[in-house]
Amino acid sequence: MDDLFPLIFPSEPAQASGPYVEIIEQPKQRGMRFRYKCEGRSAGSIPGERSTDTTKTHPTIKINGYTGPGTVRISLVTKDPPHRPHPHELVGKDCRDGFYEAELCPDRCIHSFQNLGIQCVKKRDLEQAISQRIQTNNNPFQVPIEEQRGDYDLNAVRLCFQVTVRDPSGRPLRLTPVLSHPIFDNRAPNTAELKICRVNRNSGSCLGGDEIFLLCDKVQKEDIEVYFTGPGWEARGSFSQADVHRQVAIVFRTPPYADPSLQAPVRVSMQLRRPSDRELSEPMEFQYLPDTDDRHRIEEKRKRTYETFKSIMKKSPFNGPTEPRPPPRRIAVPSRGPTSVPKPAPQPYAFSTSLSTINFDEFSPMVLPPGQISNQALALAPSSAPVLAQTMVPSSAMVPSLAQPPAPVPVLAPGPPQSLSAPVPKSTQAGEGTLSEALLHLQFDADEDLGALLGNNTDPGVFTDLASVDNSEFQQLLNQGVAMSHSTAEPMLMEYPEAITRLVTGSQRPPDPAPATLGTSGLPNGLSGDEDFSSIADMDFSALLSQISS
């Protein structure tokens, strides 16, 4: 950058006969931000140009040809000649009225200046700051007052070092002022430091045209370009001002390389460049690749993925011989096969309105072994038997029927128990059913009195006297059952259940461990124990009903 400065402002004045000032450590030109006074914080410290994150340096001068007492004043002037006093101020230790002034150490000739910061002023306070420079005689190059009015570049300043020493006679001797390199405000995009932060890819085809997204610090879209340089070759990326996003991102296409028939990868430098001051950023490496059909680098990505997978498998603790695992245990899941037949849904039994519609020819007698008759009868007997009457007294009407000899009950020969097989009745017409099923579906409330239910009804349309009930049809049904029993000489259905037969014959059943709830008479059926009926056919129902009504 030294070739950009005029030779009339040398940093080392040609004075062979006397002392002179030399800047041995220039201030860092970019990367520092000027602070406003209203920010209420320190303006920082001006670093040296060789300053790093680990090694800090500061602006340093050397007084050649002199050792002894003296003073130094450091002030801010404009970047371009004539070097007028700048409205910005130096702040820090030993600073006043916008400049720094201190005594030099007489024992050394090299002096470093730390804790110097630059504080900027607002545009509305510009005239006031210039007037203050004139009043304090802060004008190193004695620029006339009328020339101090005008525009100022508020984004760039220079440090001016003014040193005063003693001559051999002890009188003050002012040495020639020395100017530093320009210092730019990092906040201004037209003077800020150029820096490439990140790119989405750092390689492309030698034919060019690859789209690249570049992130950077603040730039001006009309004063920025992407610069490619290589051995004997330079080019610029292709983009427009619309491709600069909010001054921090640039989308451009790579230029073609000088040799389109490239056979091996070539590395070049990629930089940001500001045409106004020819400022360049730190270079970033970019690689041009030979032109192939695989423009999207599928094979390269596949190879990289495969190598990564292999390295992971080598480091895996599960990589190695393992014992064979037993076959997985199968869990039995119930399933309905195609040959399985679903069970038919139970159908409600429809009873006929009259007993005369029942066909007794369809019924077959129920045969049980002698030892199982009482048990089966007890199992079929309900727990709560209906109470027929509160008091059961035999009347004279029932004496003839009781005097008749009981019908013989067929006894089977002892043998192995036979399983009950209910024959499937043939349905003759709708509404027909077996008498046994009809009797099983009859339900009575054990807590209600049948006589009370019949006697308490005041409806004239209902039977008021049980003697008026016509039981001739039911008597004919019973006689038909007796005739069938004598003709076939086989036990008939009407001889059961066995509980009624036991009551008729007067046989006593051994007591059960948990007897059922008894009726009023002390027996499950509400009958006395001395009543003997060998069959339900021998019972005189007319006398029984008249007994209940009385």
UniProtKB/Swiss-Prot annotation:
It is found in: Nucleus; Cytoplasm. This is Transcription factor p65. The modification Phosphothreonine is found at residues 254, 434, 505. It comes from the Eukaryota. Component of the NF-kappa-B p65-p50 complex. Component of the NF-kappa-B p65-c-Rel complex. Homodimer; component of the NF-kappa-B p65-p65 complex. Component of the NF-kappa-B p65-p52 complex. May interact with ETHE1. Binds TLE5 and TLE1. Interacts with TP53BP2. Binds to and is phosphorylated by the activated form of either RPS6KA4 or RPS6KA5. Interacts with ING4 and this interaction may be indirect. Interacts with CARM1, USP48 and UNC5CL. Interacts with IRAK1BP1. Interacts with NFKBID. Interacts with NFKBIA. Interacts with GSK3B. Interacts with NFKBIB. Interacts with NFKBIE. The modification Phosphoserine is found at residues 276, 281, 311, 468, 535. The keyword tRNA processing does not apply. It comes from Rattus norvegicus.
